[in-house]
Amino acid sequence: MLKQRFVLDTTALTDLQTREVMGYASLCEGMKAILDLIADARLHFGISCYVPYPSVYKEMYEFASRNGCDREVVAKIDTWLVKKSPDRYRVSVTSQIFHEYVAYMRERINRGMGVAEDAIWEAATECLFMENPQNKKKEYKEEVEREVIGGIIGKFRNKYRAALRYGILDSAPDIDVLILAKELDAAVIASDYGIEKWAEQLGVRFVPANVFPMMIQEYLKHLPENENEPEYENRDKSKEGSSGEIEFI
């Protein structure tokens, strides 16, 4: 059987939709369950799951720490995910991809600017139609900030993210995931439209985060009935005098 490789983005472990599909309300329990599936896949099928180091590994570690996950989660990350730095100097990307990315970013920046301008006009219009008693200037300023500006800024931030950030590679870890997957000829696991879009451009296989656990479960359902032990244990027992070393792929 061909050994498969996967490169995980942080969202492969933290995606809310994935937890809901698996039936876990807690982030930490969801992460444990996914990592346990990865462990089973490693032991039974030799499937390797990589994480770019240090960028994505650091994100995962900090995410688990911020959300109060116990040391077991970090131990599972360290044990079952292969930490590897992407070779940024040897993996080449065609100039056409780079050209398209620059053009795409320029378009998104212009769209973001349009959203900002609309927000400014909306705020100015709202202010013009409010009463402004001169003897209550301080109270009026606070009211404008609270009732008008605050709400508009909130809407602006959401619209700006949607217009500018959705569908682009907006962080170094995102790029590391794609470079490492390209280097290893591996599939990317993520819940990020930007990574999905540019994985397609780079010819890298993409598996949505909410599909990945079910894929591993499907593999495990088709284990031979007499295979009750991990693959490497069966192999070692069949060889007398084996050194007991495990070759990780």
Swiss-Prot record:
Signal peptide: none
Cystine bridges: none
GO molecular function: ribonuclease P activity
Region (Disordered): 226-249
CDD domains per record: PIN_VapC-like
Enzyme class at the top of the EC tree: hydrolase
Keyword Cytoplasm (UniProt): no
Residue stretches spanning the membrane: none
The enzyme's E.C. designation: 3.1.26.5
Enzymatic reactions: Endonucleolytic cleavage of RNA, removing 5'-extranucleotides from tRNA precursor
Key words, A-Z: Endonuclease, Hydrolase, Nuclease, tRNA processing
Record bears the keyword Phosphoprotein: no
Any one GO biological process: tRNA 5'-leader removal
Family per similarity comment: Belongs to the HARP family.
Role according to the record: RNA-free RNase P that catalyzes the removal of the 5'-leader sequence from pre-tRNA to produce the mature 5'-terminus.
Protein name: RNA-free ribonuclease P
